Amino acid sequence: MAVRIPASLHRSGLRPYLAEFIGTLLLILIGDGVVAQAVLTDFYYANFLSVNLAWASAVALSCYVGAAVNPAITLASAIIRPTKQQWAQLPGKVVAQFLGAFVGAALVYLQYRSAIKAWDPEFTVPGGSILSPQGHHSAGIFATYPAAHFGSNWEAAVTEFLGASLLAFGASAVADPKNEGLKAPQFMMFALMVAIGASMGWQTDYAVNPARDFGPRLFSAIVYGREVFSAKGFYFVVPLFVPIFGAIAGAGIYDAFMFEGEGSAVADALDAAEGHDGRISLD
């Protein structure tokens, strides 16, 4: 006799992963979509401010979906405030985030394919071997590429590290159950993303999210070829890995100095190291 499992149980089990998939899809659909509208109209129908506002709105929307939409934040949360559930769900959530970003980029391309072809007939990559006569490189619509003035990718890595650290610091504050002064977490994440974009967005396009860059980059490889990975000295490695370290640092700093709740590996380690007089023991 077959056992019937209610559909609601299926949904509840899949919900964390569906939330990450849908949330990240929306993030890229909105974010890369506004970049496409700005770039393909030579910033006539969108500008740097509207690009920042759209990305920030997409991040705030993910809060309502209940998703982190960022593997760096998801991993940092599992490391800094670990639970068995977080670690059990970590692989599935990360895969869902990358898949959502890939599909989101595909939908952006589906919308703007004709406009891309008209604006950049050669389908070129920033820093690639094919030069556009007009100086247009449409691959930058989908993934991030560093500004031409950078002497090395290490300089760009600094920006990505700081941006991801600030983002994780803010996300940790939002997730702090004892942060009574926080009345509107969605607005805080919106404001934080606007601030990061306005202060750090120009030089690296502020990926601060491995899925935001690698998912669309992987899709763009179908259209633009392997140069999306090799361009700019294999720059793709920077937004894929650096935000992870930045997020761990930002979340760790928040918990070390601000967090007063339970379940923080950083706070627990500091409490264990304190002497009876409140000073750090060196014994």
Feature locations, PLM:
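Membrane-interface helix-loop junctions and terminal tails of multi-pass membrane proteins
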Residues: 1-283
